[in-house]
Amino acid sequence: MTPDRTLALCDTTLRDGEQTAGVAFSLAEKKAIARALDRAGVAEIEVGIAAMGWAEVAEIRAVVAEIAHATPVVWCRLRMHDLDMAQKTGVKRVHFAVPTSTAQLEGKLRVDRDWILRETAALVFCASDRGLQVSVGAEDASRTDPDFLIRLAEVAAAAGAIRFRIADTLGLLDPLGAFRLVAELSARISLPIEMHAHNDFGMATANTIMAAHAGATHLSVTVNGLGERAGNAACEEVGAALEAGGIDTGLDLCALPELSAVVAKASGRAFRAQKPITGDDWLFAHESGIHVDAILKRADTYEDPRCAPARFGRERQIVIGKHSGSAGLRAALLEAGLPADDAVLDRLKPLLRAHAVRVKRPVEAGDLRRMVARLARPSPRT
């Protein structure tokens, strides 16, 4: 993949993200998420599943009204009813999820491959004939014979599909496997390829990046990696990593913290403190004496500009703790208006380290004042 290439992020927080066990968005929350996604610059937003009923159709219409720039997409099963309901939303892009693995065909649908090919051709042609843009996704593609995936893509293309999605539905691929699968299909089918990765082994983001290197032009993501089981590829991680490599995704990186917070609140799923890009206030904090001494002299010693806090609208923090050295501790003391000579530093460090072990957090200015005051008290006579 060459630098300066453009890739499209297709966010499915409102569809696959909401399929997370126990997650259910209100209409107000859906609108807020849609607005935040649109401000952040994602190319496409899967806005829901119209086949859930008329209430969902009404909500999709309301959500779409909040989207100014991104392309809304309605997700469909391979059923005429789903297409009919999707059309009621007024959305002009639909996606058909097509089961492809033996387990899916035999265990879920009780059909064979020929039936899948016929239904795909018929429904894609029907949707295209109605003036809709259609993408087709191979569900459970990572457990499907690549030759059948190619046949399905050819059938979909002939019927009018504009894109083919590879779904690693159970999150079984590793980065090398993702690269090989996408590279093979990219070389053998005419449709642009979208990668949809799940995170069951913690590799969804890496698999998505490797799919981009292998030729995928569209990448399916969710905010905070929200999604079924272990989740999906995280929008903020995929976007930031690609942008760091010179790949344009259209994302406003400074909008990612707000987007992440909106989804975390609506989903009730807090992300871990050290989550890349959008973690808590300590994410861009430095404590280690070696690091702090260097970064105070020159920021890029331990902060590459491609992942510097300002790139994401964040701020660097120098915190004091067990591993602080003289440079960081002296800076903190001076900032707090406290004495910072070598004698104070030498006496303060043992107190500071014991305090850090006890409280399990960075040492704050108030803590430093109390410790310095303790040092100033006369020692009891023996």
From Swiss-Prot:
Task: Name the GO terms of the biological process aspect.
Answer: biosynthetic process; carboxylic acid metabolic process; nitrogen fixation
Query: A GO molecular-function term, please?
Result: homocitrate synthase activity
Kindly list the cysteine pairs connected by disulfide bridges: none
Is Transferase tagged as a keyword?
yes
- Top enzyme class, one word, equals transferase
Q: Which reaction does it catalyse?
A: acetyl-CoA + 2-oxoglutarate + H2O = (2R)-homocitrate + CoA + H(+)
Its keywords, alphabetically, are: Nitrogen fixation, Transferase
Q: Which SUPFAM superfamilies match?
A: Aldolase
**Family to which this protein belongs:** Belongs to the alpha-IPM synthase/homocitrate synthase family.
What name goes with this protein?
Homocitrate synthase
Q: Which organism is it from?
A: Rhodobacter capsulatus
The top of its lineage is: Bacteria, Pseudomonadati, Pseudomonadota, Alphaproteobacteria, Rhodobacterales
